[in-house]
Amino acid sequence: MDMALPEFSMRQLLEAGVHYGHQTARWNPKMAEFIYGDRNGIHIVDLTQTVPMLDQALKVVRDTVAKGGRILFVGTKRQAQKPIAEAAEKCAQHYMNHRWLGGTLTNWKTVSQSIQRLKNLDELLAHGAEGLTKKERLNMEREQQKLQASLGGIREMGGTPDLIFIIDVGKEDLAIAEAQKLGIPVVAVVDTNNSPKGVDYIIPGNDDAARAIALYCDLVSRAALDGMSAQMGAAGIDLGALDVAPEEETLEA
């Protein structure tokens, strides 16, 4: 079954600044094969390699979701936080954008207990808070906000993910180490100052520019949605029909 895949062009990558690496002095020799050259002391990524590698990464994302797999989007640096969360939410997947919690993958049991605590707090504060003192309620709200910030994006994950998508492997080295330990494949954007070690599907490119980050996130999110429609298509569900169904129900009520 030939499934759709989000399309992108070399020109889009150029316009988003995907080819701009870091200062040549900060380079990591392990990325040498993906570097085209340098311009004014900045390494330029070889986009003729990025294009097929990005395409390969998107296929893996799509196929993982088509098989019913879960994807965890990870990007905790300031400029990645919002696009990572939005992209994951758009395709009903999961994200971590606050800071990587050690043990998120390797100690899922403990993490899922914290998620349960968050759900209990939500429930309590929504319904059963009448008998609480102001101080108790305040403490609960504080705990809820803290848990929501770090776990909100994975509260519905329900287990370790089947694939991880990462922006900035230098910053997210802990996530990569945990994924490697569990044999979870990693798709990641790797800039010229980082090592691609531990990354199964490398996307060589700029990991700092807002436009580049937005482009990767959008493409990965769309690939996941393509996988979802393939999965539903295989199950005989018509996505077009899903859009109208809820309105009919409200009419009856």
Curated annotation (Swiss-Prot):
<protein>
    <recommendedName>
        <fullName>Small ribosomal subunit protein uS2</fullName>
    </recommendedName>
</protein>
<dbReference type="InterPro" id="IPR001865">
    <property type="entry name" value="Ribosomal_uS2"/>
</dbReference>
<dbReference type="GO" id="GO:0022627">
    <property type="term" value="C:cytosolic small ribosomal subunit"/>
</dbReference>
<keyword id="KW-0689">Ribosomal protein</keyword>
<dbReference type="GO" id="GO:0006412">
    <property type="term" value="P:translation"/>
</dbReference>
<comment type="similarity">
    <text>Belongs to the universal ribosomal protein uS2 family.</text>
</comment>
<dbReference type="Pfam" id="PF00318">
    <property type="entry name" value="Ribosomal_S2"/>
</dbReference>
<dbReference type="InterPro" id="IPR018130">
    <property type="entry name" value="Ribosomal_uS2_CS"/>
</dbReference>
<keyword id="KW-0687">Ribonucleoprotein</keyword>
<dbReference type="InterPro" id="IPR023591">
    <property type="entry name" value="Ribosomal_uS2_flav_dom_sf"/>
</dbReference>
<dbReference type="GO" id="GO:0003735">
    <property type="term" value="F:structural constituent of ribosome"/>
</dbReference>
<dbReference type="InterPro" id="IPR005706">
    <property type="entry name" value="Ribosomal_uS2_bac/mit/plastid"/>
</dbReference>
